């Protein structure tokens, strides 16, 4: 069974007789236990479609496609990719998928165009500055969207589940990257929260894939 979605991970855990918890659940409980209870126990929250989610998913796919091509083929091949078209196609696909799920439109052409243009500019900046973040010398792409499904220390019947956006190996050192998009920049609290997520993923990645933490 290929583990491509949170649902896949949850199904695998259930087959093992275990329950799952994601980082988003952990974070929600940490910030407000009552909110966590309402969402995951009482099931009183509903899915609210958002252009931010659509853009984030599409941008993930675009950057991951670029990096996958760069490391598996070459920098030249990655540079030849029509990343703008990849982004646009992914945004359209994700939007149509969510509209089908929720049964109504939740954005408009103007807003979609604005987010698309933001993505184009971000990718343009990234390609110009890529070398400062991702080099090829002594560097290996370990995986993209690598699954984590591992028993927690506090309860052997509960497993942490998640996906690692990008995992690199540089000079025999593992690096985990989590792609984030934001329209408001990154304040200290947001950076700290992202750090919590990466530290948790690092710990469980080391256990599951048998590498030094």
Q: Where do the protein language model's features map onto the residues?
A:
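Short amphipathic alpha-helical segments and their helix-coil junctions
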Residues: 15, 33-46, 98-103, 176, ...
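A non-catalytic, helix-rich entry segment at domain boundaries
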Residues: 62-146
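Short, solvent-exposed segments of well-ordered alpha helices
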Residues: 20, 46, 50-53, 188-192
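Long, acidic, intrinsically disordered low-complexity segments
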Residues: 1-21
């Amino acid at each position: 069974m290929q583990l491509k979605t949170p649902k896949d991970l949850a199904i695998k855990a259930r087959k093992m007789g275990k329950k799952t918890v994601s980082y988003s659940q952990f974070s929600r409980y940490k910030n407000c236990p009552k909110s966590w209870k309402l969402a995951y126990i009482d099931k009183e929250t509903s899915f609210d479609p958002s252009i931010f989610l659509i853009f984030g998913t599409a941008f993930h796919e675009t950057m991951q496609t670029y990096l996958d091509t760069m490391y598996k083929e070459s920098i030249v091949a990655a540079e030849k990719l029509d990343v703008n078209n990849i982004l646009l196609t992914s945004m359209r696909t994700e939007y149509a998928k969510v509209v089908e799920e929720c049964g109504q439109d939740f954005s408009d052409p103007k807003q979609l165009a604005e987010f698309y243009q933001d993505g184009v500019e971000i990718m343009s900046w990234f390609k110009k500055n890529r070398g400062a973040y991702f080099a090829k010398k002594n560097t290996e792409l370990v995986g993209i969207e690598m699954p984590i499904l591992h028993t927690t220390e506090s309860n052997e019947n509960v497993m942490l589940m998640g996906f690692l956006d990008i995992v690199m190996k540089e000079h025999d050192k593992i690096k985990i990257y989590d792609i984030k998009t934001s329209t408001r920049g990154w304040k200290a609290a947001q950076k700290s929260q992202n750090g919590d997520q990466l530290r948790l993923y690092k710990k469980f990645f080391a256990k599951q894939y048998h590498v030094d933490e």
